[in-house]
């Protein structure tokens, strides 16, 4: 009887430790962005507190293979020439770049991205003068990059 209780306690503790490890590692980490920013933008300043650029996505995606993301540019008074999308924790972190014309005013870009694991998804907008603006959203998803992609 004592052996059964001892084994049940060990099993219970093992289950708790697995749950704690999975829960701790499941959140998107902001620690990746400084390294990615340094590689792509070097020492350029990126402004994060703006209202005209927004990226949005689900808090938890049902599939990492097709995560819906929307990028909204409410007004192009800053003369944005391109918007790049980055997924911090993906093997290939640069997901897309959209080039805008001078005629672009209110922009709404809806797309689907593949995500390997929980990550921040970032939209970085660059102006004609070289200023950078960013909006980011954490999204929980997994397994999208490991699946087959029919091209």
Annotate each language-model stretch with its function.
Residues 26-62, 96-98:
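Transition segment at domain starts
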Residues 56, 68-74:
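Short edge beta-strand/loop segments characteristic of extracellular beta-sandwich folds
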Residues 64, 116-120:
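Extracellular Ig-like/FN3 beta-sandwich strand-entry sites
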Residues 82-86:
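Beta-strand signatures of extracellular beta-sandwich domains
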Residues 91-114:
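An anionic, turn-rich surface loop/hairpin at beta-sheet edges
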Residues 133-139:
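Edge beta-strands of extracellular beta-sandwich domains
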Residues 142-151:
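Low-complexity, Pro/Ser/Thr- and charge-rich linker/hinge segments at domain boundaries
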């Amino acid at each position: 009887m004592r052996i059964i209780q001892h084994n049940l306690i060990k099993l219970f503790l093992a289950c708790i430790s697995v749950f704690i490890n999975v829960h701790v590692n499941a959140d998107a980490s902001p620690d990746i962005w400084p390294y990615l920013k340094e590689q792509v933008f070097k020492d350029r300043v990126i402004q994060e507190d703006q209202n005209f650029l927004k990226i949005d996505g689900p808090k938890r995606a049902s599939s990492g293979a097709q995560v819906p993301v929307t990028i909204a540019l409410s007004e192009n008074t800053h003369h944005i020439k391109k918007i790049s999308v980055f997924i911090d924790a993906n093997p290939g972190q640069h997901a897309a770049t959209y080039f805008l014309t001078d005629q672009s005013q209110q922009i709404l870009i809806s797309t689907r991205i593949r995500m390997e694991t929980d990550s921040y998804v970032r939209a970085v907008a660059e102006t004609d003068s070289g200023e950078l603006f960013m909006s980011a959203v954490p999204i929980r998803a997994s397994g999208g990059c490991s699946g087959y992609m029919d091209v």
